[in-house]
Amino acid sequence: MNLDNAKCFKQRVFIGNLTSEHLNKTVTIAGWVKRIKKLGELNFVIVGDKTNTIQVTCKNKEQVKYLTREDLVIVKGKLKRLDSVRFEITNPTITLFAKSKTPPLIIEDKTDALEEVRLRYRYLDLRRPVMQKRLALRHKVTLAVRNWLDQMGFIEVETPTLTKSTPEGARDFLVPARIREHSFYALPQSPQIYKQLLMVGGTEKYFQIAHVYRDEDSRKDRQPEHTQIDLEVAFYTKEMVMDLIQRLFVDVFRQVLNIKLKKPFPVLKFAEAFNRFGSDKPDLRYGFELEDCTDLFQDSPNQFTNLINAGGIVGGIQLPNLYLDEVSFKALRKLAKDNGVSLEFYSDKASSLKQPLDLPLAGTILLVAHKSKTQAWTALGAIRNELKYHLNLVKPNQYSFCWIVDFPLYEFDEKEQKWVSAHNMFSNPQPQWLVNFENHKAEALSEQYDLVLNGFELGSGSIRIHDPEVQTRLMQSLGVDPQQFGFVMEAYQYGAPVHAGMGLGLDRLMMIINNVDNIREVMAFPKNAQGIEMHTNAPDQVDIKDITTIWSKHPVK
C-alpha cells in the first residue's frame, strides 16, 4: 500500500456520516459509481457506499471520461449543500481505485434482476443499500439479544458442530470421519443434547447464536443451514421461560426498532388455536375466525347434503362487507385444492352455491366441506392466512406475538402409520400424564410452548425430561432404543436439574421485521430454492481420490 492510499483511508468518511459540520471543508469518500450524468460543461457522478449516495459535481471531463457504473473510486473535494437535505461534493479529485466490468444486474434498491441472478452474483447484490441495511439490522438485533441475555446472567457457550447422528427430526447432513472406519459425524439439527448436558454440568443459564443444519426441502421460511437464538435454563418453570422470552423481545424491539410491543403476549391452547384459526401458528393481526356452518345446510337439499348425512362438516370464514375479485378467488380455490378440499363462496353479489343462503351480514362467506374436521379446518386455516394478502388486512411494522401451549405429546404419522413425537422426545409430559402417557398417545399433552409472530412459528421450546426412567419410557413408546442416547441417559443419573429451553429462528425473525417474503432476503449467502449455493455451485462433486483416501485402510465394500 502506498502512503497516499493510507492517508486517504484514514481521512475517509462514510457518506451517511457527512453532516453540516463538514460543510465547506475538504472531505474524502470512497464508493462505487452508480450513475453519470452530463449537463453542459458539468458532469454529475453519483457515488455510493453502504451508508448512502452523494452527488459529485465535476467540471473536469477528463476525470470522468473513463468512468463506468460500479467503478470503485476515491473522491476528495469540498462539501456543499445541494438542497435543504442533501449534500454534494464540488471541485473534486476523483481517483479510480478499481475498474469494474459491466455488472449483470442493476445495483439499486429496486432491481429487475431475477433471484437466480442475484444469488449467482450475491457479492454485487449485497452492494444494494437495502441489502446492507438488512445486514446491519440483523447485526443490531443479534447484538441486542446478546447484551440482554448477558445482563440476565446467561453465558454464551459454543457447542460442537461435528456431532452424532441420532433418530428423530429431519435428515442429517453427514460428514465422513477419517479417524474411524466407515463412520460419520452429523451436523447438528439443534444444540439440543449438548445444551441439556450443560444444564447437568451446572451451567444453569446458557445461550448461543447457533448454526443448525437440516437436510430438508427449502421453503420461503426454511434453509438447509440457518441460525437460531438458542437458550436453556435450569430451575425454571414453563411460565418463567415464557416471561423471560417475552421480556427479551419487548426490550429488543424497543431498543432496535423503537417499537413498543403489547404485553403480555396472548396465550392460546393448541386445541383453541386450531378451532379458532385452523392453525397452531395463527396470525392475530386480524380476525376472521373459523366457524362451523353445517347448520346452514341442514334443512334443505344441497351440494353438501350427502357429506353432512355421513357425519361430515362444513366450515366457513365470514368476510363482512368484503368481496373477493376473480383473481383472488381463483388463487384461494387452488390453495384449497392443494389442501384436499373444494372452496365455495356465497355473497350478496355472486355465489358458487346452487342455493341461496340467508346471511345476517352483507359481504362474503367462504366455505369448505370434508368428512374430517381436521382436514377442513387445516384447509380453512391456510385460506385464512392467505386472505391478508388479497384483502390488505395488515400494515407494515405491525407485530402480533402469541404463545401456543398444551401441545399433544404425540402425533400420528399417516404416511408411516405410527405414533411419533409431536415436538421432540426430550419434551416432558404434563404432570397429569406422567403415570401413563404411553398408554394414551392420542390424549397425552406435553409441556411444550411455541412462540408465534405474525403467523410464523418463531420458536419452540419445552420443559425437558430430566428423569432417566421417564425418558426411557418415552423413547421405548416411540420405538427408539434408549441405548442410542446412552450418553444422555448416563448424565441424567448424576443429579440432573429440572431444565427448560427454546430455539428461536433468527432468520425468520429478520424476515418478518424486514417485511420480506422469504428468508433468503435477510441472509448474506443463502442457498436457492433447490438448496444450491449459486456462486460456488455447492454442493459439488469432489475428486474421487479425496473419497477413497478417507478410509484407505478400510475401503467401503
Swiss-Prot record:
Name one molecular function that GO assigns to this entry: nucleic acid binding
Q: What class of enzyme is it?
A: ligase
Give the residue ranges for region: Aspartate: 192-195
Where along the chain is ATP bound?
Answer: R214, D215, E216, Q223, E457, G505, L506, D507, R508
The answer to whether the entry has keyword Glycosyltransferase is: no
What reaction does this catalyse?
tRNA(Asp) + L-aspartate + ATP = L-aspartyl-tRNA(Asp) + AMP + diphosphate
Q: Kindly list the GO CC terms recorded for this protein.
A: cytoplasm
What UniProt keywords are attached to this protein's entry?
Aminoacyl-tRNA synthetase, ATP-binding, Cytoplasm, Ligase, Nucleotide-binding, Protein biosynthesis
Q: Which InterPro entries match?
A: Aa-tRNA-synt_II (IPR004364), aa-tRNA-synth_II (IPR006195), aa-tRNA-synth_II/BPL/LPL (IPR045864), Asp-tRNA-ligase_1 (IPR004524), Asp/Asn-tRNA-synth_IIb (IPR002312), AspRS_core (IPR047090), GAD-like_sf (IPR004115), NA-bd_OB-fold (IPR012340)
Q: Which Pfam families match?
A: tRNA-synt_2, tRNA_anti-codon
According to its UniProt record, the EC number is 6.1.1.12
Tell me, which GO biological process terms does this entry list? aspartyl-tRNA aminoacylation
Q: Where does L-aspartate bind?
A: E168, R214, H423, R464
Q: Where in the cell is it found?
A: Cytoplasm
Q: What is its main location?
A: cytoplasm
**How does the annotation summarize its subunit structure?**
Homodimer.
Q: What does this protein do?
A: Catalyzes the attachment of L-aspartate to tRNA(Asp) in a two-step reaction: L-aspartate is first activated by ATP to form Asp-AMP and then transferred to the acceptor end of tRNA(Asp).
Family note? Belongs to the class-II aminoacyl-tRNA synthetase family. Type 1 subfamily.
Quote the protein name from its UniProt record: Aspartate--tRNA ligase
